């Protein structure tokens, strides 16, 4: 591995993995160049990045960060980094797999917010929707409850004012 190009690639991989809490290992074999380009674009739109490199280099870079994915790095593999929206990136992978009859790319495993996860967890993340969608749903739920709470407080205030007014008369 003393080859200069491999050393540069390894350094670049380590730099890319700095501060990354969520990533997925995927099998991309069977995608056409056009499909791979579209996948990269979709992932980039969700704040992620698709990295294709030799498994040995990917594994070395991951192991330096204390993350062992030797079991998932078999056959052609790519690393999908989810910097901003882990669920959105997982959904982009799921959508891309749904657009072709072979279900490619195939998720082999992942690392979500500091924990190694299996394929089922990544699929569950993909079904959640994007971060902004989840935030909008949360705001909607909270505002509905706050509105009800304000109504209750208003009714209680009116009741107290009514009792206070009848006592002074």
From Swiss-Prot:
Keywords for this protein: Ribonucleoprotein, Ribosomal protein
Domain of life assignment: Bacteria
Any single GO CC term annotated in Swiss-Prot or TrEMBL for this entry: cytosolic large ribosomal subunit
GO molecular function: large ribosomal subunit rRNA binding; structural constituent of ribosome
Stored InterPro entries: Ribosomal_uL10, Ribosomal_uL10-like_sf, Ribosomal_uL10_bac, Ribosomal_uL10_bac_type, Ribosomal_uL10_CS_bac
Gene Ontology BP term (one): translation
SUPFAM superfamilies cross-referenced by the UniProt entry: Ribosomal protein L10-like
Gene3D superfamilies assigned: 3.30.70.1730
PROSITE patterns, alphabetized: RIBOSOMAL_L10
Subunit structure, as described in the record: Part of the 50S ribosomal subunit.
NCBIfam families: PRK00099.1-1
Family of the protein in this entry: Belongs to the universal ribosomal protein uL10 family.
Name used for this protein in its record: Large ribosomal subunit protein uL10
Gene encoding the protein: rplJ
């Amino acid at each position: 591995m003393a080859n200069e190009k491999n050393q540069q690639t390894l350094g670049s991989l380590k730099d890319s993995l700095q501060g990354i809490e969520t990533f997925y290992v995927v099998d991309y074999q069977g995608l056409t160049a056009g499909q791979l380009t579209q996948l990269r674009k979709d992932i980039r739109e969700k704040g992620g990045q698709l990295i294709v490199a030799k498994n040995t280099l990917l594994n070395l870079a991951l192991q330096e960060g204390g993350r062992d994915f030797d079991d998932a790095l078999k056959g052609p593999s790519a690393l999908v980094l989810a910097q901003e929206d882990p669920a959105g990136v997982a959904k982009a992978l799921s959508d891309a797999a749904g657009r072709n009859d072979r279900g490619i790319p195939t998720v082999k495993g992942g690392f979500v917010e500091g924990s190694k996860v299996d394929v089922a967890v990544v699929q569950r993340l993909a079904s959640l929707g994007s971060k902004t969608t989840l935030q909008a749903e949360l705001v909607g739920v909270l505002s509905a409850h706050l509105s009800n709470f304000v109504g209750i407080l208003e009714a209680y205030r009116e009741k107290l004012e009514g009792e206070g007014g009848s006592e002074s008369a």
